[in-house]
A protein has these predicted regions:
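Non-catalytic C-terminal accessory domains or segments of carbohydrate-active enzymes
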Residues: 347-364
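Short, acidic, Ser/Thr-enriched surface-loop or helix-capping motifs
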Residues: 31
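Bacterial Sec-dependent N-terminal signal peptides
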Residues: 1-20
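Active-site mouth of glycoside hydrolases
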Residues: 24-28, 36-39, 44-244, 249-257
Length: 364
């Protein structure tokens, strides 16, 4: 084989390999065929992380840890574990993913709780990472369902080690322990988790990318959040140069102080938008950022509103070539998500007991 032909083959297969993955080019996200794509997705909130409002236990527990602790005190550790095992096995199934695809979506965002992948720092020696099978099994199964339906799966670290914000419910933050930002050990564990995930999924073309931290909300300097994000990026890139890295700003993905310019050439800025009006000026700040830094945008989370608001928001995003992911796919007793879970008297009794509105004898 002559050198010119060999070089052409290297270029061809290199381009072909790169085009198999969701990637970026200037201000656009490109699909596996290299064509511009608008991501239209849903977030699977409430599955791997139970936020109080989604479970209807606001006033009964501030976060998942409190809810689980109270449940253990009421029904015991064995029964509580059985509840969580059944929850994880049944909250999202292949039927959900089949439905998401059949309804016209092309992507899914998976909010992950770190404690399904590794132990808290309080339960390990310094620097140790004990890997747990459950989290990886959930991602593996979900990825297979997404492959079957040709949906891109975006991994989202929703609850980081220690919790990344003052809002306890969003990240399962325990105020009695150091947060992500107050503990080098928690930061190291977060980096190690993304290192592990990137190593495992580096060759998976239906992984759409890595949303490395959901909605941080903490008094931070721009350099503090950037330094952690760069560490995570470096860990990912040590294994995986294929996948997009999605970056959320501080204060619920709306403050990008210190996070510009981009430090990676396959990066997307992911903002969130809730409740404000759907006019051009409400997103002009992110459009300006896109234009200044020649980087794509993704509206990675919005919802909890009326159908009229949803329609206006989607029109606004798509008129500006911005993909979106709706939140959430389902939750208990609601009219503002795609699906609503019908509660039952036993669950309602437990919640009312946690809120102090019922006695134990009328609950168990």
């Amino acid at each position: 084989m002559n050198r010119s032909l060999a070089l052409l083959l290297i270029i061809f297969f290199g381009v072909f390999s790169h085009a198999q993955f969701l990637t970026t080019s200037g201000k656009q996200i490109l699909d596996k065929n290299g064509d511009p794509i608008i991501l239209r997705g849903v977030g699977l909130g409430g599955w791997m992380l139970q936020e109080p409002y989604m479970m209807n236990f606001v006033g009964g527990a501030d976060n998942q840890q409190q809810f689980r602790s109270k449940l253990e005190s009421l029904i015991g550790e064995t029964n509580t574990q059985e509840f969580y095992d059944n929850w994880l096995d049944n909250f999202v199934t292949k039927t959900d993913i089949d439905s998401i695809a059949s309804w016209g979506f092309n992507s899914v965002r998976l909010p992950m709780h770190y404690n399904l992948f590794t132990l808290p720092i309080e339960q390990e020696d310094p620097g140790q990472n004990t890997w747990l099978d459950k989290g990886f099994e959930i991602v593996d199964n979900l990825l297979e369902w997404c492959k079957d339906n040709q949906l891109y799966l975006i991994l989202d670290l929703h609850a980081a080690p220690g919790g990344q914000g003052y809002d306890q419910g969003i990240s399962d933050y325990d105020t009695s322990k150091p947060s992500l930002w107050e503990s080098d050990a928690n930061k190291q564990k977060m980096v190690a988790l993304w290192d592990k995930l990137a190593e495992r999924y580096k060759n998976e073309e239906w992984i759409g990318g890595y949303d490395i931290l959901n909605e941080p909300n903490w008094n931070l300097s721009g350099s503090e959040i950037r330094n952690l994000y760069v560490q995570v990026t470096n860990a990912i890139r040590s294994h995986d140069t294929n996948h997009i890295i999605f970056i959320e700003g501080n204060w619920f993905a709306n403050d990008y102080t210190g996070l510009t310019p981009p430090w990676d050439d396959n990066m997307v800025y992911s903002f969130h938008k809730y409740w404000n009006v759907n006019t051009q000026n409400t997103i002009q700040w992110v459009l300006d950022m896109r234009n200044q830094y020649n980087v794509p945008l993704w509206m990675g989370e919005s919802g909890e509103n009326s159908n009229a608001w949803f329609k206006e928001a989607i029109s606004l995003f798509e008129d500006n070539d911005i993909g979106w992911a709706w939140w959430p796919w389902k939750r208990i007793e609601t009219t503002v998500s795609s699906l609503s879970i019908t509660s039952n008297s036993n669950y309602n009794a437990v919640v009312e007991y946690f809120k102090g509105n019922a006695s134990e004898e009328h609950t168990v």
